[in-house]
Amino acid sequence: HRDLHSFPTRRSSDLAGSAIAMQIIRVQNRSVGLPAIQEPEYRSITVEAGMSARQVSQLLEQARLIDDARAFERFLEVSGDARRLQQGTYLFKRGMSYASIAEEMVNIPQAVSKRSLVVYAGYTLRDIDSLLGNSGLAGDGEFLQAVQTVAFERGLPFTEGWFLSGTYEISQQKHVALSLAIAMQDALNEAVRPYLAELERLDITLAQAIIIASMIQRETNEVSQMPIISGVIHNRIKADMPLGIDATLRYGLGVWDRPLTETELQSDHPFNTRRTQGLPPSGIGAASMAALDAALMPQDHQWYYYIHDKQGNLHPAKTYGEHKENIARYL
């Protein structure tokens, strides 16, 4: 039937921070079964107000950016930079010289302008990277690099989906991409904190909830439809039914502007939820708070199928026969 999956319009489905927060994420992700994020070339540190040269040197050593904290501290003392280090979040490439690291933390603009940046729900990490580039706030690939750094440092099992959509205040200085990535990840951590009991009730991990939220977001922008779609996804998972959400395959193939071919729909691609059982390997975009809420608070019903009609209205069904009738009636 008619393909309605082109982003950002509504879609149909053919079948379907803090240390405490970091600890929660690591515990919840143990059973995900995905390969760990590889250690990135860049690492970040945050220098708090009042930190001494020794404390900063120890941070750098802990981040494996330098081998010897005492040697770097002595370098700062000899160069006269020990008392000139500025607070802030910094992104360093492994293997940088002592002089280059010190210069980053000493020579920063004092007057920094700020602007609001809207990261729309459903945006992929590549979309956000392009948004920063087109806004002149960061270079090509900087945000993708930053999320890899954040994911590694926080023990995330994958990157896509762990960064909450919304409006963010951006300081127009160095490391804008890293600052945004940290802010988006912190926002998601705070958003999920009240729902930890729901994870146990639903018998899913936080990582799985985030994948579900990203799928819901791609399926609809209508908040009232989200709990219904979430209920369908959870029902199908419990019944060991393929999810059949074509947006996952579109994400995996990077195809949003044309109908999927029959060959693609029948492929064994890991993001093809028509063919593979269970959830895709990662999220497929940035969820909104509403989608996250729906993923963790699905509507309790007996539907296993749904479609959107040409006006975007949702038509769920309990059986495949009812689903076929809805297709004939509404599409």
Segments (PLM) and residue ranges:
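Short, small-residue-biased leader/transition segments that mark boundaries at the very start
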Residues: H1-S12
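Bacterial extracytoplasmic/cell-wall-associated proteins, especially those involved in peptidoglycan
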Residues: A21, S52, R126-A138, F152-L331
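Aromatic-residue hotspot detector
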Residues: F7-P8, F72, F143, L188, ...
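Signal peptide-directed extracytoplasmic domains
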Residues: I20-P194
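Single-pass alpha-helical transmembrane signal-anchor segments
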Residues: R10-Q23
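Short alpha-helical segment immediately N-terminal to, or the first helix within
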Residues: H1, I45-T46, R218-E219
